[in-house]
UniProtKB/Swiss-Prot annotation:
Zn(2+) 1 binds at residues 148, 151, 201, 204. GO terms for molecular function: ATP binding; heat shock protein binding; unfolded protein binding; zinc ion binding. The gene is dnaJ. This is Chaperone protein DnaJ. It comes from Zymomonas mobilis subsp. mobilis (strain ATCC 31821 / ZM4 / CP4). GO terms for cellular component: cytoplasm.
Amino acid sequence: MSELDYYSLLEVERTADDKTIKTSYRRLAMRYHPDRNPGDSDAEERFKAISEAYDCLKDPQKRAAYDRYGKDAFQGGGGFGGFGGGAQDFGGFSDIFESVFGEFMGGRGQARSSVQRGADLRYDLKISLEEAFKGKTVDIEIDVASVCDACHGSGAKAGSGRKTCDTCHGSGRIRVQQGFFVVEQSCPVCQGKGEVISDPCPECHGEGRCEKHKTLSVNIPAGVDDGTRIRLSGEGEAGVHGGPAGDLYIFIHVTPHQVFQRESYNLFAHVPISFTKAALGGSIHVPSLDGEQYEISIPAGIQSGKQLKRRGAGMPVLNGRGRGDLIIQIDVETPTRLTAKQRELLEQFRETETGEECPKSSGFFSKLKTILTGE
């Protein structure tokens, strides 16, 4: 079994990329894994052979040597240190089964359609809270698998095309004798597609796609929040053999702000005020993300932790009308350094205190005295 060509064992073409080789290996390993075929020596031999093949082809240096010299490149020198290690790549039979279960349960006896939708892509974009407030248009750069300009996605060299696979006669499946059983499997020549390219495109090597560098403009609407997902339809990877392109998803990450915290569409901020303003009342001016200065009235006797609200001064509602609220939490600041005059005035104030000025503190100490003395 191991005398077969490694590419044939893995049912891939010699031009297959690493992802294609890995996918095919996992599919075959799931099919022939000893846990799934107890007591089947043929399946065990097949499993060892595909593991040997994958251990070689997954390593760029080993693959290059194999492509040039075949197995002779590894004779007499200890080889690769023992084949069969590829099985550890997936951890166990259950992992293989989970990764390729969908493919295994696919229809039998029919060629797998060569038309496939392109993969979706993800791009993570960081913006500031100010940018989330106002919205903006940003340019992003990505590398994406796009339709090959040379063959226009056909995978075939100009002047040539696809033809029906002579091995499976277009069915995409072949039957293989294994011991007393005949099993059906994907055609190793056309990889289950039912068609082959006789003269591959030299630019994309028959894939029909090439990686391209693209610059895209992304419109960030006002009001986006951390975790908002924006879809750019058709900007993902190009489809295979005429299939539709995937989508590009922009995931928004809003960096923390030094002053404001966001909760839904409301903006919160801690605002310190002097103890005299807290006692006597007054007003403060609070800047917002829209550049406006909002005047907030401070009632006399306000305490630390009290929240004051300015309606309609928060974040814009995404794809809607109106805005959230601006909510400020008052932090009364006690002076740490006093002039002689200020200390004198505060001493005079203390001499005139009756306890009614701060009912909570006087009530607390009265209650504590009652608890401790019983009076």
